[in-house]
C-alpha cells in the first residue's frame, strides 16, 4: 500500500523536530498551533493546510521547499520499493520449491 502524502510529510516534520532535539510543545508554541493538532499532523492523521505547513516550517527554521522535496523523495523510494517487492512476488508465483510435495486428492464422482 502506498503511503499517503500527509503521512510522509508528517514523518519529515517529526524527523526535523527530533533532529533538532525539540519537543512538540516547543514547536507548537512557536507555530501557534495546538500541541494535539501538531501531533496529529506528524502522525499523518490530519492534513495540514499550506498555511499551517508554512507556520510549522518557520517554527522549525526549515524551508517548506525542503520538507516537500524530502517528502517527494521519500514517496519515490517507497513506491520504488513497493514495485520491486511486487515484481519479486510475481516472479515467485509460478515457482514451487523442489522440496515441496503437492498432494492432489483423488475425487470420485457419484452418479445418482
From Swiss-Prot:
Residues 24-43 bind DNA. PROSITE patterns: HTH_CROC1. Pfam families: HTH_3 (PF01381). SUPFAM superfamilies: lambda repressor-like DNA-binding domains. The keyword Transcription regulation applies. Induction: By vancomycin, requires sigE. Residues 13-67 form the HTH cro/C1-type domain. The keyword Ribosomal protein does not apply. Disruption phenotype: Depletion experiments (via anti-sense RNA) show greatly reduced induction of the clp regulon (clpP1, clpP2 and clpC1) after vancomycin treatment. Key stress-response regulator that plays an important role in multiple regulatory networks in response to different stress conditions. Probably controls the response to vancomycin treatment; vancomycin induces expression of the clp regulon (clpP1, clpP2 and clpC1). This is Transcriptional regulator ClgR.
Amino acid at each position: 500500500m502506498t503511503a499517503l502524502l500527509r503521512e510522509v510529510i508528517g514523518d519529515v516534520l517529526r524527523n526535523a523536530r527530533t533532529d533538532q532535539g525539540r519537543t512538540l510543545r516547543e514547536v507548537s508554541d512557536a507555530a501557534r498551533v495546538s500541541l494535539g493538532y501538531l501531533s496529529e499532523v506528524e502522525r499523518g492523521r490530519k492534513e495540514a493546510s499550506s498555511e499551517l505547513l508554512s507556520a510549522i516550517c518557520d517554527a522549525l527554521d526549515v524551508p517548506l521547499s525542503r520538507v516537500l522535496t524530502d517528502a517527494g523523495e521519500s514517496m519515490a523510494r517507497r513506491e520504488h520499493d513497493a514495485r520491486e517487492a511486487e515484481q519479486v512476488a510475481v516472479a515467485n508465483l509460478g515457482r514451487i520449491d523442489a522440496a515441496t510435495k503437492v498432494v492432489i486428492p483423488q475425487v470420485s464422482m457419484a452418479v445418482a
